[in-house]
Curated annotation (Swiss-Prot):
Cross-link Glycyl lysine isopeptide (Lys-Gly) (interchain with G-Cter in ubiquitin) per UniProt, renumbered positions: K58, K64
Gene Ontology cellular component list: centrosome; chromosome; condensed nuclear chromosome; cytoplasm; mitochondrial matrix; nuclear chromosome; nucleus; perinuclear region of cytoplasm
Sequence ranges assigned to domain HhH in this UniProt record: 48-77
Post-translational modification Phosphoserine, affected residues: S14
Signal peptide coordinates: none
Organism: Oryctolagus cuniculus (Rabbit)
PTM annotation, UniProt: Ubiquitinated by the SCF(FBH1) E3 ubiquitin ligase complex, regulating RAD51 subcellular location and preventing its association with DNA. Ubiquitinated by RFWD3 in response to DNA damage: ubiquitination leads to degradation by the proteasome, promoting homologous recombination.
Name under which the protein is recorded: DNA repair protein RAD51 homolog 1
Pfam families: HHH_5 (PF14520), Rad51 (PF08423)
Amino acid sequence: MAMQMQLEANADTSVEEESFGPQPVSRLEQCGINANDVKKLEEAGFHTEEAVAYAPKKELINIKGISEAKADKILTEAAKLVPMGFTTATEFHQRRSEIIQITTGSKELDKLLQGGIETGSITEMFGEFRTGKTQICHTLAVTCQLPIDRGGGEGKAMYIDTEGTFRPERLLAVAERYGLSGSDVLDNVAYARGFNTDHQTQLLYQASAMMVESRYALLIVDSATALYRTDYSGRGELSARQMHLARFLRMLLRLADEFGVTVVITNQVVAQVDGAAMFAADPKKPIGGNIIAHASTTRLYLRKGRGETRICKIYDSPCLPEAEAMFAINADGVGDAKD
């Protein structure tokens, strides 16, 4: 009898776990959607019912074998499973209070960000070379694996590297600092090298499939814009570049919404060479224009300080005040600057 009660309790727990978080698109079969149509959705990159519910109708119609009538039925059933209506600000405030923040490794930087890098949104870091963008990414790839009470996200990290600057040795140094097993830390980081803008976008489809299978806390794209500077050149291709970049950023935002992962992207800067630059205190601005500015939830501007110290400024945020903090790049990752 006791054994039976234990089994029932375990079954209840597994049901609870299943109903929490993003649900696989295969659940649509229970709502009367044909298994072949579900397979077509998966092949097109829709791996969760949330991905289907958030998609515009024309995106589903573009899938080979999905007619307008089928698209309507799929969207209707997905909308029943995913809550997408109005909610009170009280309920939303409650959900916001449960958001996990991942430590950057520096207490001063965490204080500036009111806890750390926020999950479920896009954080953009931009600055010149040697300002610490990649070093923060490497540190976050380890700290996201820490328990929540130690400032982590209790999940794996995904790292898309477009500049060839990923170094596993740095992860091992940070892991040692936090007392984590080096081999476990490396096993929990999924790494991919992006070779062009189309490949970079294709990797996000793979990322979506992997996130359904396993718990990921962080997705890093370092750098999100480097390949756009080389694949598209001149003003003639500016419109095409911005449209492609907008689609890429929209996919990132969708992954943040669907899976609640922290998305961290790095961006490069460009020197302003027009007449106004003469009067600007700092004649450098992030590339990508308004497209990337609107897609990022929080924008951090990094610049060099003295020696190994770096300065981080809140450039844009919906809730953080404009302020600065100093941090240092140490042998064991990002830390506090020594006075």
